[in-house]
Amino acid sequence: MTTTPFIHEIRVTWGDCDPAQIAYTARLPWFALDAINAWWEEHFDGEGWFQMEIDRNMGTPFVNLSMDFRSPVTPRHRLMCETYPTRLGEKSITFGMKAYQNQVLCFTGSFTCVFTQADVFESMRAPDHIRDVVEPLIRSE
């Protein structure tokens, strides 16, 4: 198990912003999901959601997203998304996230997905190869 946190860097651009000159609210879940996909890629040999769905016939649709906004996100600094699993259930996984710009906490979040057999869209048990990687990395929020 590694003690180094997984941090995904997001380049926030002018196009991500609304007239208030901060990141458009709808972009923040987008950034979070991008970081979660990057977490999968980092821990599963470059395989993210696309490969899991198409090559492995395993989907992970979201059933819950919760975010608390702490400070505005702007293009001024990179958004650093610390991403980590907080729970692995029988058929679901929950990720936690802390997103910072310039060492200022911008948002926190909790994101739960269920494992599905993609071609029939039915829930399934988390595969053993997923459990083997995820279980040692689970941490509290």
Positions of the model-derived regions?
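HotDog/MaoC-like acyl-thioester-processing domains
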Residues: 3, 7, 74-78, 86-141
